[in-house]
Structure formats: structure tokens, C-alpha cells
Regions:
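Short terminal hydrophobic/aromatic SLiMs and anchors at protein ends
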Residues: 9-10, 20
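Small-residue-biased structural context
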Residues: 15-255
Length: 255
């Protein structure tokens, strides 16, 4: 019978047959003195957040705190956003929230919106149009319709609600004023459910189109759409776990 053994050292844990050892990567801590490059390689998805903070590549062996200071980014906020983005179970506490800069957070969220609207959607549309044209009348208009619904739902929330209602309200609070016509609890109940539109679109791309219609392009665009959807979900988590409770603290501090 194969024997199992547990070995512990400073870098790895193993639990495996004596002739087969499984090595598990030690998790990089989300801390100020962690090397910035190590944090990025811990979760590659964090790389796409850097332009939203105005942080470029070429950070060498500098720490998170050093890179943030160079780029005039609040270090606590940067680490908090990375932690929420990477670990959906993480919820910062009141003391942690009070250390961040809300102006930096709004700038980050607005930059995320520009990324979605100016880069991701145009990229997807360019490639999706080739597939729509190849589908013919049976599936092309339907695929285009579900994509348009998906995009409009996203735009309705981030461009017309967050940019025109929520963010101006928060900026008013930061200016020391309070309006009785709105509070942040309304924001919690206004996240749109776009999953149905996304499911319909993905069903056409993956299940119902004939297999010989641009299969490689369909796989690539499906991955792009799923990546965007995942990013948007994590964006919502950042708003729910950081923005909303922080603004609640501001509201409660107002007379």
C-alpha cells in the first residue's frame, strides 16, 4: 500500500505518496512591503488594473508602497482593491476603510468605466461583427440583438446611473454638503442583472451556431466576453465592499 506523508517547511506544503510530491505555491501577501512584481504574478488579472491607477510597467524590485508613492496612489486603497478583486470573500473593516482616499477610489472607478466603454466593448464589437456577418439571416440578427442588449444594460448602469447620479452625489458629500434626495442605500439595489442577456448570447455562440462557422473566432470572442463579464462582476464587488460602506460612513458622520 502506498504511504502518505506530510512535510512542512518555510516554502511549501506537501501531502502526497512517498514517491510523488505535490508542490503548492505559497500565497504572496497583500502588504505594503511585498514586491510589486510578486503581487502581479500572484494573480495575473491584477495587471489589467494598473492602467486604471495610472501605474506603468518597469517597477523592478520596488515594493508596493514604493510603486504607489511614485505614482501618487493611496497604498491602502490599491492593496484593498487588489484584495477584493483577487479574493471575492474579502471584506474590509471600518478601520481599514478609514485609511483609504475616496477621491482615488472614484478616479479608479471612472477609469474602469472608460476602459470598458472605450477599449473592451469596441474590441469585442470588431470581432463579433465578423461572426454576425458569417451567420446569415438565421442567427446573425439574433446574436447582434443579444449583444446590444448586454452592452446597453452595462452602459445604463455605469454611464447613466453611476456617472450621472452616484458619483456626483459622493463628490457633494466630500465637499461637506448633504442632499436628502438620495442616499447610498439606493445604489446597492440598482446593480442591473445582465446575466440573462449574457447567457442568451453565449448560448448562440457556443451551442446553436453551426460548428463550421468561424469556430476559432467564436472561441476567442467567447473568452473575451467571459473575461469582460468576470471583470465587471469584480468591479461591482469593489463598489459593494469598498465604495458603499465608505459612503455610508460619510453619511452617518453628517449632521
Amino acid at each position: 500500500m502506498t504511504s502518505f506523508r506530510w512535510r512542512e517547511d518555510t516554502k511549501i506544503h506537501t501531502f502526497a505518496p512517498s514517491n510523488y510530491i505535490v508542490m503548492l505555491k505559497k500565497k504572496t501577501p497583500f502588504m505594503k512591503d511585498t514586491k510589486f512584481a510578486e503581487l502581479m504574478t500572484e494573480d495575473r488579472r491584477l495587471l489589467q488594473l494598473l492602467p486604471r491607477f495610472g501605474i506603468g510597467l518597469g517597477f523592478g524590485d520596488r515594493s508596493v508602497a514604493q510603486v504607489c508613492q511614485t505614482n501618487q496612489v493611496n497604498t491602502e486603497l490599491f492593496l484593498m482593491i487588489c484584495e477584493v478583486y483577487s479574493n471575492g470573500r474579502y471584506r474590509p473593516g471600518k478601520e481599514e476603510l478609514q485609511k483609504i482616499d475616496l477621491g482615488n477610489l472614484l478616479s479608479y472607478l471612472k477609469a474602469s468605466h472608460r476602459y470598458y466603454l472605450d477599449e473592451r466593448f469596441p474590441h469585442i464589437e470588431e470581432h463579433l461583427q465578423h461572426i454576425i456577418e458569417a451567420c446569415g439571416k438565421k442567427y446573425g440578427p439574433m446574436l447582434g440583438h443579444f449583444y446590444d442588449e448586454y452592452k446597453q444594460e452595462v452602459m445604463r448602469h455605469i454611464q447613466y446611473y453611476e456617472e450621472e447620479v452616484v458619483f456626483p452625489y459622493i463628490e457633494t458629500l466630500l465637499g461637506g454638503q448633504r442632499t436628502s434626495s438620495y442616499n447610498i442605500n439606493e445604489f446597492e439595489h440598482n446593480h442591473t442583472n445582465i446575466q440573462d442577456c449574457l447567457d442568451d448570447m453565449m448560448n448562440i455562440l457556443l451551442k446553436y451556431l453551426p460548428g463550421d462557422i468561424l469556430p476559432k473566432e467564436r472561441i476567442e470572442i467567447s473568452l473575451d466576453i467571459m473575461e469582460l463579464s468576470d471583470d465587471l462582476n469584480r468591479h461591482s464587488l469593489i463598489e459593494d465592499r469598498i465604495l458603499t460602506p465608505y459612503v455610508e460612513l460619510l453619511e452617518n458622520a453628517q449632521p
